[in-house]
């Protein structure tokens, strides 16, 4: 957790409404540091549906493995999140810690261990002492209230400089339903199916299979379209919980993701995911500039995504942006190395709406002073036009600064 807030942080924080069927509490358990809030417990009412997407890393954390196994049941009563220790690459000890944490949480909440979901973030490779949860989770279960999402978001931060929350309210049938979300990120972010840690709660009555389909679809153009440093975490987890409490106020029970009554809900749900994903990009470690990369005219959307990610993950592109240099040559390099169809002589590039390259060469109207001034902006939009087809996609990233090196060089110390 940084002491200075990113200059890209949102100027305002939304008021997070209560969601019926969800109670939250946080505590200091001394997971890695003293005098730091590092545990979150979310308690959900019986019958709450759960869905999740996770890292595709071949070295997943013990909590990720636990959640994947329990997701099959489709129901959740509690979520336990700790910061400071990822419980990843910890072998049998890590799996035992996960099992013990779930056992303690189940006893505290009064449910089956199969209804407990877990997430950990922090240092990889160090054993997690799950006995630190003993007593703590019991107290949290007793004191949990349907309230402070901002405090909950703070509890899961590591190198984040600000808590990330988002909310939306929408009609489902004749009833109002609420969607609240929180996330943490900052570094080791190049998601594949999920990203970092993020948790979304709603009172909509949506069945587990339908919620899973909505989540899997929703992450594709939100969390999966964000990268900070090209490194996919061992712990990436996105969980969604639907308490169904809005059914008491007339919200229809939804069993299929294709139900037309979900149209407005899906839009709001995806907006919450997009909001959280952008906040993650805004809080990239050491970031001073938010970068949006759009690739159009590709053969396919998938091809456009791959090229956009190649640009977004290029250290040379990212450091040029940090230096406020519209170095389109580095963008050309990143396009060429992506391994996707591209024609040098059809390529056009612009920075913040100013075209710098056209048809494979520098734009004849290029004005160095104009472009240099545009690069001073805190938000940079790079557009690449390939001229090959109709494929288009957009990804978010940030610049790469000296602060990123300092943060990660000192991470374990």
Curated annotation (Swiss-Prot):
Free-text function comment from the UniProt entry: Catalyzes two activities which are involved in the cyclic version of arginine biosynthesis: the synthesis of N-acetylglutamate from glutamate and acetyl-CoA as the acetyl donor, and of ornithine by transacetylation between N(2)-acetylornithine and glutamate.
Provide the protein's localization: Cytoplasm
Gene Ontology cellular component list: cytoplasm
What pathway is this protein said to act in by its record? Amino-acid biosynthesis; L-arginine biosynthesis; L-ornithine and N-acetyl-L-glutamate from L-glutamate and N(2)-acetyl-L-ornithine (cyclic): step 1/1; Amino-acid biosynthesis; L-arginine biosynthesis; N(2)-acetyl-L-ornithine from L-glutamate: step 1/4
* Alphabetical UniProt keywords: Acyltransferase, Amino-acid biosynthesis, Arginine biosynthesis, Autocatalytic cleavage, Cytoplasm, Multifunctional enzyme, Transferase
Q: Which Pfam families match?
A: ArgJ
Q: Which family does it belong to?
A: Belongs to the ArgJ family.
Q: Which GO terms describe its biological process?
A: L-arginine biosynthetic process; ornithine biosynthetic process
Q: What is this protein called?
A: Arginine biosynthesis bifunctional protein ArgJ
């Amino acid at each position: 957790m940084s002491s200075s807030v990113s200059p890209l942080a949102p100027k305002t924080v939304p008021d997070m409404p209560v969601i019926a069927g969800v109670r939250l509490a946080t505590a200091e358990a001394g997971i890695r540091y003293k005098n730091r809030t590092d545990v979150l417990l979310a308690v959900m009412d019986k019958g709450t549906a759960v869905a999740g997407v996770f890292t595709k890393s071949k070295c997943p954390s013990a909590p990720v493995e636990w959640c994947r196994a329990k997701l099959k049941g489709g129901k959740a009563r509690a979520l336990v999140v700790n910061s400071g220790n990822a419980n990843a690459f910890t072998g049998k000890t890590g799996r035992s810690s996960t099992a013990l944490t779930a056992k303690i949480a189940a006893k505290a909440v009064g449910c089956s261990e199969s209804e407990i979901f877990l997430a950990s973030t922090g240092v990889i490779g160090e054993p997690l002492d799950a006995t630190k949860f003993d007593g703590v989770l019991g107290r949290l279960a007793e004191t949990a209230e349907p309230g402070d999402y901002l405090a909950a978001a703070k509890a899961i931060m590591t190198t984040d400089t600000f808590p990330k929350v988002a909310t939306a309210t929408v009609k489902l049938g004749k009833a109002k339903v609420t969607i609240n979300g929180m996330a943490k990120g900052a570094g080791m972010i190049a998601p594949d199916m999920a990203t970092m840690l993020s948790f979304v709660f709603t009172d909509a009555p949506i069945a587990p299979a339908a919620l899973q389909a909505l989540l899997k679809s929703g992450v594709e153009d939100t969390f999966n379209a964000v990268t900070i440093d090209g490194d996919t975490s061992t712990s990436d987890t996105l969980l969604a919980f639907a308490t169904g409490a809005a059914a008491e106020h007339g919200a229809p029970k939804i069993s299929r993701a294709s139900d037309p009554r979900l149209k407005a809900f899906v839009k709001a749900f995806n907006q919450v995911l997009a909001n959280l994903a952008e906040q993650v990009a805004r809080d990239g470690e050491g970031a001073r500039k938010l970068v949006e990369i759009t690739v159009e005219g590709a053969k396919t959307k998938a091809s456009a995504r791959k090229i956009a990610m190649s640009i977004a993950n290029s250290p040379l592109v990212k450091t040029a942006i940090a230096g406020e240099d519209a170095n389109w040559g580095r963008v050309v390099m990143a396009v060429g190395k992506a391994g996707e169809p591209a024609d040098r002589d059809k390529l056009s590039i612009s920075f913040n709406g100013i075209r710098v390259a056209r048809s494979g060469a520098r734009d004849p109207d290029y004005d160095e002073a104009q472009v240099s001034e545009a690069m001073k902006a805190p938000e940079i939009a790079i557009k690449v036009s390939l001229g090959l087809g109709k494929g288009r996609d957009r990804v978010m990233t940030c610049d790469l600064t000296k602060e990123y090196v300092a943060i990660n060089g000192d991470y374990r110390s």
